[in-house]
Amino acid sequence: MFKKVSAALLAAVVAGSALAVANAAESTGKGALDFTIDSPYKNVNWETFGQYKADFHAHSNESDGSPQPFDTVEEHYRKGYDVLALTDHNVTNTTWNRKDDPTGKGRTYLTDERYNEITNGTDRGGRGMVAIKNSDEQSKSDHLNTFFTPFNNSDGATLESNIAKCQELGGICHINHPGRYTGGKNTSGTAGEDASNNHATIQKYVDLFMKYDSCVGMEIINKLDGDSYSDRILWDNILEETMEDGRFVWGFSNDDTHSNAATGHSYNMMLMPENTATNVRAAMESGAFYASAKVAKREGYTNTNIDEINSYQPPVITNISVDDAEDTITIEGNYYNTVEWIADGEIIATGNTIDLNDYEGKINSYVRAQLKGNEGISFTQPFGVKSDIAGKANLSVDKNTVVVENDNKTVTCTVSVTNVLGANAFDAKLSYDSEVFEVAEVKALTEDTVISSDKSTDGTARMIIGTQTPVNGAADVMQVVLKVKEDAKTGITSLSLDSLNTTVSVTSDIFEGLLTVADGAKDIEVISYRELSDVNNDGEVTLKDLSLAVKNYRPENAAYDIDRSGVVDTADLIIIASYIA
């Protein structure tokens, strides 16, 4: 993967290169960088998978909600939910038809008959609603929803200790409404934004996500976007840090239901082959879902009148496709007007398709999309992005055989590049066996070379090169002439293009990285005509050796092919005869 370097460091070399890159990119349709896209939707079959509406944060009067537990379940079922986690504060939800009384408050749960009807969907066309069991909003500290985990926190618990316990027990969790604790919920001026951009705050969450992989994500929408007002800002800040190490943090949208009326406005669409608790967990872990909301205040959806928004339909995503060869992501859907693409917290593009090459310098480790419609917004999960300098490096040689008796016992090696765009600085390294070869010459082959610094050491030919004319397409970069040493042993020896580091200029940034070596290994045979002429290996060249070669005249027999031409011919016989005393 490339790294950014300061433009000032190479100012003398890169003058005019940005314009050259822009012109070349326009003509080729590709960029200076080659992207690898890691999509959380890569295993989703959009034609056969179902989309299942899920709420992972809901309350009843087991804690501070108003409905009975059975009614919270019924309301979600009535409103078309397919998945529900009942997450009362500090109460472990075991099953919706439980017979015990965990709170001692005499609460009412589903009957066994009704439980079976709802989970099997017998009165909803067979579309059952899946119960996420052993769920709990651990609330002794910053709130954390734990799933598939039979435990309840105790006094003195912290956010981290609850995450650690969840992981120890084999469950998963997500962090709830962080803006309540960070100050991100503050809507006064830039207070919420400033709180979500606070470095110490960001680092706190980054550290937790990096330490505990069972903490799969965080709420980016909670209820009608009250506490979560600035949590998308925090999410992007976290992603900037974690995605560099390949750590995805999924964004969840939940009603945090405390009343029946507050149900149905913020939810997650799980993409699964079948609606089962096992598949739900797999989707929560892999990111195979998107988050939808009718209210997202920073994005312009500010109507919180429940009577008005009850019938709203946020955008539905119907397909996401990634073309790694073209470095593109395409989204299709319904109920939307525009698709915005976000990297490092900034909207960088709009439209159904993003070509990452069009936004080089703006995309680092991730990009995500949000679909905006008249009645709400839907957020994709982040796509992981890794980038390398586009192009390939190659090694070629002028010969594959060197004769020690010849005056010209050298091999000329050429290091070249293909399909690069705007490359103007190179660091090429070629390794060889120092017991066989010595370097006779190293030189730059680039056009308008302004600097060539020989950094060769014993066994390695290396040169740093800078050119005023950036390379677009294919070019030879470095030439190395290797000479066979006088005391070199005969046999096969290998040459290797170890690396070719280069830079490209993209807008105001310079990117440095290794080109992929497409063809970088060459075997060279060092031969002695005198040794090979002794075909019977008796220590001397005599008529016997010539006789054997004559008998094998013309067949493709390497033992008698002295000059390595591919056939035994007159030239081989002449060589043998020349060594007969």
Q: Which stretches of residues belong to each language-model region?
A:
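Append "Rare intracellular matches occur via the same short Y/T/C beta-strand/loop motifs
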Residues: G104-R107, S365-K372, V415, I575-I576
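Surface-exposed, proline-enriched loop/turn segments that connect beta strands in immunoglobulin-like
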Residues: L395-N400, N536, I562-D563
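A metal-dependent hydrolase metal-coordination microenvironment
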Residues: G29-E193, K223-L234, N254-T257, N279, ...
